[in-house]
Amino acid sequence: MLCVLLLAACSGKKSGSEAYVKVLPDNSLAIVKMDLGKFLDESEILGNTFIKGAAGKGIGSLPENMRPLLQNIYDNPAASGININAPMYLAVANVDPVSMVITMDMDNMEAFENALLTFGMGEIEVIEQDGMKHIVTGEDEVACAYDSDKLIVVVDDRYADIATYTELAGDDMAVNDKRFEKLFEGDDDQAAVYDLGAFGKELVRSGEVEPEFEPYIKMLKGCVMYSAANFEKGYACQNVYVDMPEESREALDKLMKKPTRRHFGYIPANSFAVFNCNLDLTSADKLLESADVKEMLEENGITEDTAKEILKALSGEYTAASWVDGDDVENIQGMVVVDCNDRLVFDMLVSIVNSECDATIVDSDVYALNVNKREQYNYYTYEYETVTKGSDYYLMYKNGVIMLLPENLYNEICATGELKPLADNIKKNRQFDSMGNLMVDFKPARDAALVYMRNDSSSDVKVLFEVLDMLKSFTLDFNLYSYESRLNVNDDSVNSLKYLTDKIISIVVQNGGF
């Protein structure tokens, strides 16, 4: 019953000045805002034919005295008594033991109480205490209370006490804390604020973090992360930003720079996923002062000076890509390209590779990894023989870059012995013009699934194709303290949430749901 009323707690654009948000403590590790009403409005899920049919069956199965009320709440969620123009908030005060509070804005206490008692079928007891009406749960770990301003649910592994949150002083309220200001004033569909420093401190205190990682967790002191998600026409997006001391931000800006895409000429045009970033690892040499890092270097026979040379050599562009080889959807290939201005690092890498596999020299600074070869026992000859399946991978060092790539791509890029851009490279795929650090183009994957369906018409493959058919592309643009992701769908004429909701419900129905 309470779940029904929670779902009816819907959206709005209110600020954080209402009484119901004053129960959120400022020492919260995290506060999440859930705009369920906006979800209902944008998805139009309650108007979906299949959902209405399923809801009708569910309501029809209830006792007769409940049906009119629940149907009324389904048709008009405001009839639940909860303010449909205000978001619901969840604050986490502790992780071990768990302690959290959920609060919603009360619009009509009489309507809420009527719904509560009707669905409770005489089994719910309500008592008045300290100016609020308390729902008797029979559990020490869960408490629920309401008045004309708010509905509060408290969950605490030790003892759930409503008064802990209703008697907060002004300075102890999150609504008066600048860390949470954007959360209360913003109009995002869904949003959350995480105090990373407090989270880290709590994890250390509870013993969830191994001692050797404590110094890194302590580096989060003063860092607060804000996350927001929104659904727009044609796409859904999420933005995350970590507010941190200026000194820390400047250090991270030095470590990660804007990518130049200088390796894109080597990436096949039919790639469905490409990753690209630009790192200046010399700015991370302070990590070498860590006792744990020093111990790791000593175990591998690497001096601190050599480690600094490695960081310097590997500073630059990093690019990786994946694609389907022809029509063989089970043969997904990939490549990695890394800037390296010192062949010493390549020699070290070759040494590591040789310890793991039987690499052979193909050309100067080119090694075949022989990953497509394996020993197989021949029952006719009673001997083991080498069997080759699929494409081998090559590891090479040329023109200041290290490349790991399939044999067939190597033959095209290095046909003359020197690096040569592909005639059909990713720059010709306009989808990737808008990419930041990562992009996934779902069309090649969708085409591959379509080919696969010719040989396998099982429901699982059909579902995979239907899911891929909803999506156009995914992009991710990030640095070390913020990122923006965007999921583009194949219809930009409607809100992406409605589009995805309708499609997913349709897939469920086709596979026997509802």
Q: Language-model segments: what does each one mean?
A:
Residues 134-206, 387-470:
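A conserved glycine-rich beta-strand in the N-terminal activation segment of trypsin-fold
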Residues 308-319, 323-330, 341, 358, ...:
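Extended, amphipathic alpha-helical scaffolds
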Residues 10-138, 174-225, 234-333, 344-358, ...:
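Structural boundary/hinge residues at secondary-structure and domain interfaces
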Residues 96-97, 107, 129-131, 144-153, ...:
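Short, solvent-exposed coil/turn segments at beta-strand boundaries
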Residues 106-147, 343-398, 433-452:
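Short Gly/Thr-rich strand-loop-strand
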Residues 37, 106-109, 149, 157-158, ...:
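Solvent-exposed coil/turn segments that connect beta secondary-structure elements
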Residues 1-8:
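Sec-dependent bacterial lipoprotein signal peptides
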Residues 434-514:
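Extended terminal
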